[in-house]
Design a protein with these regions (language model features):
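Nucleotide-activated donor-binding/catalytic signature segment of Leloir-type glycosyltransferases, i.e.
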Residues: 74-90
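Aromatic "clamp/platform" in nucleotide-sugar-dependent glycosyltransferases that forms part
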Residues: 91, 110
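A structural motif in glycosyltransferase catalytic domains
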Residues: 32, 47-51, 61, 154, ...
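Conserved acidic donor-binding segment of nucleotide-sugar-dependent glycosyltransferases
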Residues: 143-151, 160-162
Length: 188
């Protein structure tokens, strides 16, 4: 057929799969993503502690960024028994691809001016769990806000979003269902 595409390419799906493969994260795993310098203010520690409380042990916490607390966070993850599910990537130039592979965005900062990472996550369509601070509380309307030290609240918010996200994906955007629909519509 001249000029008619008979296949559908979803770049975001493939880039997300590439990142998961590179990081050793199973394709069926849930991914919680944080982006930012690994320092005390960014408070990634609370994300690691929340991961340890999640019932779904097939959930990974990916932190994109580098900073002075990388080793301390690795040690904390090991001590909580989640060292194999916490990934500190260091500095990355392909952060946009990380948003495509994540299921939930976690922004646990103690303080922030204009939270660019939250805006990027929202623009990528990710549900956001963020601290109730200036900036993020103005932006986050679909997601959950919590106090920076509320580990249980963060864990519960992540689980709630994962469950609702899984239902949405299954019902609305299963890639195989979309491909079958496209084949039926175009008779391919």
């Amino acid at each position: 057929m001249g000029g008619v595409r008979n296949h559908l390419v979803l770049q975001g799906v493939y880039k997300g799969q590439r990142i998961r493969k590179e990081l050793g994260i199973p394709l069926d795993a849930k991914v919680v993503l944080s982006v930012g310098e690994v320092n005390k203010n960014k408070n990634h520690k609370v994300g690691i502690e929340a991961l340890a409380k999640l019932r779904d042990k097939n959930t990974y916490y990916v932190i994109c960024g580098r900073g002075p607390l990388m080793e301390a966070h690795k040690e904390l993850a090991q001590s909580l028994g989640v060292g194999d599910r916490v990934v500190l990537t260091g500095y990355r130039t392909d952060v946009a691809d990380f948003y495509k592979m994540a299921d939930v965005f976690l922004f646990p900062s103690f303080r922030e001016g204009l939270p660019v990472a939250v805006m990027e996550a929202m623009a990528s369509g990710l549900p956001v769990v963020a601290t109730r601070i200036r900036g993020s509380s103005d932006l986050v309307q679909q997601g959950d806000l919590f106090e920076p030290t509320d580990v249980d609240g963060i864990a519960k918010a992540i689980e709630t979003l994962q469950q609702s996200n899984a239902k949405y994906e299954t019902a609305v955007f299963d890639i195989h269902k979309v491909m079958e629909s496209m084949k039926t519509i175009y008779g391919v």
